[in-house]
């Protein structure tokens, strides 16, 4: 079982789709060696050094958190059913209403569209909010995603810069 990393007063909560098999095995988020999450958030400015998956709780020191839409581990996110995503979206709204971070970053456009029934979502900041929490859609850092490291870092940096502009 992989636990959420959440606390009140966070700048951002990164929301993955669901754990991969490596994460399920180790108990840490984004644990597969091919997953670029830890590298991307460091290079985008969220952390002062590249954390390892087993250091995930140190994210709270940077006012960042992690959760997932769906708890069930799979090899590929495409194995997650629509009903699981919709249910996960409702649970995610509950968590965000409870913790009220400045921003929620859903990592994957299709997962966001399905979980929140939002067709035609664009990358970046969304029109919808959850309370006062901004909602962003960022590319998934999975090694299965064809996005280059530079494109991932640029997308995540846009969020970091937007939060810095707001004094967060």
UniProtKB/Swiss-Prot annotation:
One of its GO terms (cellular component) is cytoplasm. It is found in: Cytoplasm. Pfam families: UDG. GO terms for molecular function: DNA binding; pyrimidine-specific mismatch base pair DNA N-glycosylase activity; uracil DNA N-glycosylase activity. Its EC number is 3.2.2.28. It is an enzyme of class 3 (hydrolase). It catalyses: Specifically hydrolyzes mismatched double-stranded DNA and polynucleotides, releasing free uracil. Keywords: Cytoplasm, DNA damage, DNA excision, DNA repair, DNA-binding, Hydrolase. GO terms for biological process: base-excision repair, AP site formation. SUPFAM superfamilies: Uracil-DNA glycosylase-like. The keyword Hydrolase applies. NCBIfam families: PRK10201.1. HAMAP family: MUG (MF_01956). Belongs to the uracil-DNA glycosylase (UDG) superfamily. TDG/mug family. Binds DNA as a monomer. Excises ethenocytosine and uracil, which can arise by alkylation or deamination of cytosine, respectively, from the corresponding mispairs with guanine in ds-DNA. It is capable of hydrolyzing the carbon-nitrogen bond between the sugar-phosphate backbone of the DNA and the mispaired base. The complementary strand guanine functions in substrate recognition. Required for DNA damage lesion repair in stationary-phase cells. This is G/U mismatch-specific DNA glycosylase. It comes from Klebsiella pneumoniae subsp. pneumoniae (strain ATCC 700721 / MGH 78578).
